[in-house]
Amino acid sequence: MITFEGVEKVYESGGQKVHALNGIDLHVDKGEIYGVIGFSGAGKSTLIRCVNFLEKPTAGKVFVGGRDLMSLSKAEIRTVKRKIGMVFQHFNLLNSKTIFANVAEPLALVKTPKADIKKKVTELLRFVGLEDKARDYPDQLSGGQKQRVGIARALATNPEVLLCDEATSALDPQTTGDILKLLKRVNEQYNITILLITHEMNVAKEICDKVAVIEKGRIIESGSVFDVFSAPETETAKSFVKSAIDHEIPESIQKLNLKHLYQLQFVGESSGKPFLSQVSKRYDVEVNILHGTITELQGIPFGSMTVELQGEDGEIGRALEYIRRENIRIREV
């Protein structure tokens, strides 16, 4: 649905060339929720703005729905952009207009008949849970309600793609969760492809199918949410994952200088097995649990535990082999 091929974006600043995007290759399948995560200045916003041509790439190709935007005329680009909705960080609502008028704005701009506008806007306000706010104004709404209006407005033209630019970063955690659930409903009910950029790994963890990590204008790691969260490869990805799932041993434990420390990662059915008690029963090994966490990734239980194994080296070795046979990943700390 969305493809970047060798995309570059270069700005001139003080006589110097600044590469905001540097050789971006990325593919988002139709109906997917794809997250791009990175720190401030990594190139996230520039990347997403290339999809609706608010930014024109310096080099490379951007395909939306199979069409290369770089080869289209201005009129053709306008046609493609009508199938792309956008949700902004700070809502971008018109304060002088009612909620109904804000959602209706994209339809009014293309001279949609008034009866069709009323029907569509009413449907969308009902969908986002704000049907009773149609006559209100933006300053009468909470932040979460304003973002619901922004989502309804973005859906007004029946887009095939929805771009979300830090759509939850101005919201509190509870409201963030509500907005993410709404975006998931948008994806499922309307079969809309969502490209979402964020600096919050928890956002990607909650609703994305796949995620890419961007740093200094380059994609440094990408894959399914499960793969990136369970086995991050780069230091930047590890840092983001740590913010959502803390695998690290507390510093107070590290100071004890314990031996035979192992991090165990278990997935799916193995998450519910009492394998540690079995280790103690089968082998002359004591298990000291130092740290642990369990969460869900794409509906699959995923846990991590740091343990100290106490006993003779031979017994510890046999215990580790047993744990591996239970399909549990082991990493010596």
Curated annotation (Swiss-Prot):
The complex is composed of two ATP-binding proteins (MetN), two transmembrane proteins (MetI) and a solute-binding protein (MetQ). GO terms for cellular component: plasma membrane. Part of the ABC transporter complex MetNIQ involved in methionine import. Responsible for energy coupling to the transport system. It is found in: Cell membrane. Its EC number is 7.4.2.11. Pfam families: ABC_tran, NIL. It catalyses: L-methionine(out) + ATP + H2O = L-methionine(in) + ADP + phosphate + H(+); D-methionine(out) + ATP + H2O = D-methionine(in) + ADP + phosphate + H(+). Its main location: membrane. This is Methionine import ATP-binding protein MetN 1. It comes from Bacillus licheniformis (strain ATCC 14580 / DSM 13 / JCM 2505 / CCUG 7422 / NBRC 12200 / NCIMB 9375 / NCTC 10341 / NRRL NRS-1264 / Gibson 46).
